[in-house]
Amino acid sequence: MKNTLRFVLRRWLLIVSAICLVITMTFCQNSAKRINSEADEYEILTPETGPGPHINGPLVYGCRPGHPFLYRIPCQGERPVTFSAESLPRGLILDQLTGIITGITPPQGDYDIVLSAKNKYSEDKRIFKIKAGDKLALTPPMGWNHWYAHYNRITDNMMREAADIMISSGMADVGYQYVNIDDCWMNALKHSDSLRVGPMRDDRGNIIPNRHFPDMKGLADYIHLKGLKAGIYTSPGPLTCAGFSGSYQHEELDARQFAEWGFDFLKYDWCSYRKIAGKDTSLEAYKKPYIQMGDLLKSLDRDIVYNLCQYGMGDVWEWGAETGAHCWRTANDLGYYLDKVYDVALKNAEHRQYSKPGEWNDPDYIQIGWIGGAGKQSAPAPTQMPPSMQYAYMSLWSLMASPLFYSGDMSRLDKFTLNILCNNEVIDVNQDPLGESGLVINHNDSSFLMVKNLYDGSKAVGLFNRGKEQREVTAEWTELQIEGRQTVRDIWRQKDLRILNYKFSTIVPAQGVVLVKMTPKN
């Protein structure tokens, strides 16, 4: 009997051990699958740059004759790099060690310059056209804005740190150049932070920065020393959206003050002007404050890119350029609707005919990495946007020729976020000098194509999947209005795929994109 019990017990223990082993192995396999899936989701597509120099940035640059000139040559590659510029017009000086061009813009005309960057590995050259004339922002402006990271917590030190990181992270090396303050740099009459409370104007009517910004000119100078540009914010109303001092009835004083401080970009936000306009919703009422500031900016001896922000009222894309603005918001703050990036982009794309060099539709900032919640203006936290949608987000903004302003915490940039922000071939699509905004075709509930003509005769094509499962998406030559053999290049991975004759089909990740360039094969 005892032997029988021992045998049964031994068999039972063996069975239990086997079951435990199977459960453990299954759990480990499932965990591995989950981990691998997560790793795949956060796959970095942008190749690492080599040690040799590679010049990036726009091929054409607009500026006004006789005004101060500042341009940092965007260039990847191991430092030190020696820069040179053949046929640089008189009045401009290149620092060969930093690649920063300064001076006074030459007389009206087009100036073709050959930029060169050389280090111990190799040399790169690029044609760069300076167009001295009436137009600025001949390609969509690129930079950083503090709002969706820091809201009313912004300080002078944070702005300087952002400028430092724009250089050290490599963002400036692919073309990001503006470091922009949004709301909350001035005084308010009431605020939870006592250092932001004080008189809004001095006895002469000059606007007073709050105590977190002790030296506005010093801040702009600090940014300029790095070859970058400084942006500022105000409202045509008496108060900004956050309740700080606006520019109402002090427009000329403020415009001149911004220029004296050395700012290069102005965001002009409707905010409390709605109380001034009252019930008047006529086109003239919408235009009035923006025309006034636009005329003032054009009268200054400084190039200031003008960003008109009033959320698309009165079909602003139809008349924004009349005010002298270089870009205009086409919708409400995107921070409240980050789950609707596709909807916002598709609506913005409907206005593509109004987008051209010096005149850009602006669907708001790129919000990835660490961002604050728009509703409660909370501290930055990792974005909840799926990685595949982050690739789609950047691809959409590039295809639409939208201004590229990152608005996340610069101090928490990670490799994945920088891979999204700093792919130079994706940015080339955004900065293409033809200035076209992409055309949406073959649109259904689950997928669509966005097609953009490029200056060299090729086309950038985004194959987008809005669904929650991966799917095959096809671009046929007849839809793209191309014919014959085409070299298909994966723009994110920066590699040629194959030569095709009549269509391109690919599996697109859920909520994601495959972004390609189609170049005729001779």
Predicted regions and their residues:
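Proline/serine/threonine-rich low-complexity linkers at boundaries of modular beta-sandwich domains
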Residues: 35-53
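Solvent-exposed, low-complexity, repeat-rich "mucin-like" stalks and linkers
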Residues: 36, 53-80
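A short beta-strand micro-motif common to beta-rich folds, especially ectodomain repeats
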Residues: 73, 109-121
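Strand-loop-strand motifs at the edges of beta-sheets in extracellular beta-sandwich domains
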Residues: 91-107
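Aromatic-lined carbohydrate-binding/catalytic grooves of carbohydrate-active enzymes
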Residues: 148, 162, 166-280
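Glycan-recognition surfaces
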Residues: 253, 303-409
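Carbohydrate-binding surface patches
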Residues: 391, 397-400, 405-407, 442-482, ...
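C-terminal beta-strand-rich structural cap/linker in extracellular carbohydrate-active enzymes
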Residues: 499-522
